[in-house]
Amino acid sequence: MVLNEQLSNMYQPYFNELIVHLKSDGLVDKVQPSFLLGLNREKEGKVSIGDETWYTQADLKVMIFGKEVHEWGWPKLENGTQLGSDDLVEAYEVFYSENYRDTFFLTDGNSKLSKSPFFRTGFNGLMDGINERLKKVYPGKRAAFLWNEISKLSTMEGRSRKVDDPMIHQCELDYFHVIPQEIELLKPDVVIFLTGFGEPYDRYINENFHIQSTSSVGNISMDDVVKLELEEVPLAYKTHHPGTTTVAGHGLNDAERWNHYNAFLDDIDANFDKIQGLQ
């Protein structure tokens, strides 16, 4: 069984249970669809017969977390067909097939989401920084990057669930707590949280990962960058969301943001020897 099939099969019972409770609790019209990952990239014009080797055969696997999804929306199905988890997996795969280009994320296409600061500044910047460092040390090796969200459910407006409706978060905890299974199946070597600091996102990280310790990186304040020792992955870091423009009452400009990024990118570089796929 290929990895993408394992991932899809894992989602199915969780999603079915989640939908039952979202409907019974009167929440289904308040939320965007649960955020599911998929590995198939388009092949012969179809993601259904797509290729997952871009990820499975990568030497370095990086997962980048945002806060919660915006601009996602429920897929439109024909003939009143009931929405299934595979439809949401395919929605992710179509988005990735249209915008992911191995060494950069397309930000001038038709998707409004791909033009967001998360992809334009954060995702693209980190892809470029990691690929540049990897090429210098291991010129024959290749990295793959997956987008994820630490909040698998968000309101229709895409805002924090803590502000809008804590019942939605409880539904995720009770019926769609899938991030640990995603990590177990996908086995990322590096996890980067572009979630910022404080509630509710620090709590969401703690709900999904076992944090052994935290430490500073270089000379950067732990209010801006934190290295996380996680039980689940070799390397993990947390910093501000790319859309953040003010921190502790002062502006966060591009130069400061790149000081933060370069600090943990250099730390990743210094720890490439911890990555099994690079040895």
Give the residues covered by each predicted segment.
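A polyanion-binding, active-site-adjacent surface
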Residues: 2-186, 190, 196
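C-terminal capping/extension of enzyme domains
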Residues: 1-13, 163-180, 199-279
